[in-house]
Amino acid sequence: MNSHIHTAAQKLAQGEVIALPTETVYGLAADASNSAAVAQIFALKNRPTNHPLITHISADADIGYWIDASRMSDEIWRLTNALMAAFFPGPLTLVLPKHPRIDASVTGGQDTIALRSPNQAVFQDVLSELARIKNTLNVGIAAPSANKFGRVSPTHAEHVRAEFGDAVWVLDGDASVIGIESTIVDLTSGVPRILRFGHVTPNDIERVTGIVPILPERMGSDVPRVSGSLLAHYAPTTPMVWSSAENINETSRVALYHSDDFALQDYEQAIRLPNNAIGYARGLYHALRTLDGYAAEQIVVETLPNDEAWYAVRDRLNRAVVGSHLSSHLGQNKLNKSEK
């Protein structure tokens, strides 16, 4: 066994918070059964304690340990089994009724739990080693993205180190191959409700379940709180604005674009991402961190296609645009106060 795997699992078993790679983004990880360790996650991230975490489990885990079967109808079981067969392990998180034994600190005080099994060998190996050390199969790792709350998620080990320095031990598992957070689907009503867009699309969910999922804009307020659902999120410190492709050449010194029919030849601080949603998502957060490092007045982002394949990327960038302006405003207020 890789000694780093054992070290990671040992640190988790001892109640430490570490950073682990997944196929989506790097996570700030703690033993989900250790409420003190989970509290450290919230403190390190400056994350509100009512903002629930995703619990990551092994590919062959018994979900019966984590969920309240008495609140699972036959239809909820059917949906759960179908989606797990298709996407566990993978970039899908399921929201289900929480078993009373699960500490409320992981779930933000809610009676639901968010479960995912990462499709990442290093993470799965850490889960297996943690189970061996603790001598139980019922292990879970709580792991939100390894960044300060509301900021750009990390997809490389160096992103985490830049965020937390020596305060967090990082297990380097190379770059995240998907690059954005998992799709979150709430099954507690017996109908799939997408709470966060991700790599798994609404069409994917319909194909597997036979049901057209309810999209976020069609829901009321009676849905569980979940990671990444705030209006302002995933944000750099530099203000971001949308722009059409034809206007980017005229307005931009720092830009993020994808069109194939032009190039920003004279703009060293422009990044072109692939002109497809999967490739764009894979490079998005690394590109935002790079552009943010230029400390420009603004980052101009080329508008994206409106089809389903781009839902998740558009969602992240829409929230980043809002969050970047809030971040810039707060930063200016701090500067003004320091000058008084």
Label for each model-derived stretch:
Residues 1-340:
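Active-site-adjacent structural elements in enzyme catalytic cores
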